[in-house]
């Protein structure tokens, strides 16, 4: 089976890194086309032996990219076209249909209650999404929560399959030596209590709440933020105004899999933390929180479908808190008062094993190739 993955960009992001990890475990021939920004993940895919095509799209309305994508799909002889992220889902589904590929799968990575990839969920966004969705065979939701959102949007339930994001749990297993080495590299005192946050530095992630919480905590508490984005400048200003600039460390974008770039990879950064905090009020999955649980960290979160969809007891060490500085400050104080516990991975780490996700996705591919065009989908 030959599968073409179409994605909007290949910078360091959750969907992009999840794609790279999945491709390492899919027993089919995969190629990837990125509409824009090849980025670090493109280099990682190439290092893994995956052929990556760059379409060179200049913006959302660069319609000249569509015929180029159609030609690429036709030449490739693909059995399945699998699209990821809003723009790629729209262009990829259309291109696949024009190229004669009917087995089209799309993964919905980022649908929230009020936004998708930073876009407000207005009438136009919804209408365009549903128009494109009708050209596909299957829409994959990364969590039952996202599946419910898709149904409320109007996506027919028979066309929705849940394939959770997966992690390589062994990569995140805690290592005391790695913790000490990473703290030395980052200049973090061995005795400091380090609160960590991972994600795009964007307003919706609400990392400002963690900066506010830090100002309410003792001076030996540090905040380690892993990620990059448009909110970084505002967060630095907020830290200066709160008097905690010297206690906040911005680590930048870091890959889950070491890629040869300077600086520690995400598993090492998680090892350096004492508590993982996720103040985002709206998530589609919450992959970073699952990775933190795999690293044996206590997790405090505002929204995390990956945790909330689990059976009781599968995410020991994870607790929900309010999206407020005072709530996170209390959570840090409580966790610290309990003392250091053994850093053992939670059951959630095994529940979201990437090999299980890959096996479920292979089932989706097989069904998409085998079955006729579903009711409600367009046909030529």
Residue ranges and their predicted role:
Residues 5-64, 149, 229-230:
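N-terminal strand-loop element at the rim of the active site
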Residues 13-21, 193, 197-216, 230-236:
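A conserved mid-protein helix/loop that constitutes part of the nucleotide-sugar donor-binding site
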Residues 34, 298-302:
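Short hydrophobic beta-strand element within catalytic cores of glycosyltransferases
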Residues 63-67, 102-105, 112-135, 148:
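Nucleotide-sugar donor phosphate/pyrophosphate-binding loop at the beta->alpha transition
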Residues 73, 253-254, 261-264, 268-273:
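Short alpha-helical donor nucleotide-sugar binding micro-motif in glycosyltransferases
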Residues 145, 166:
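Carbohydrate-associated surface elements
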Residues 281:
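Aromatic "clamp/platform" in nucleotide-sugar-dependent glycosyltransferases that forms part
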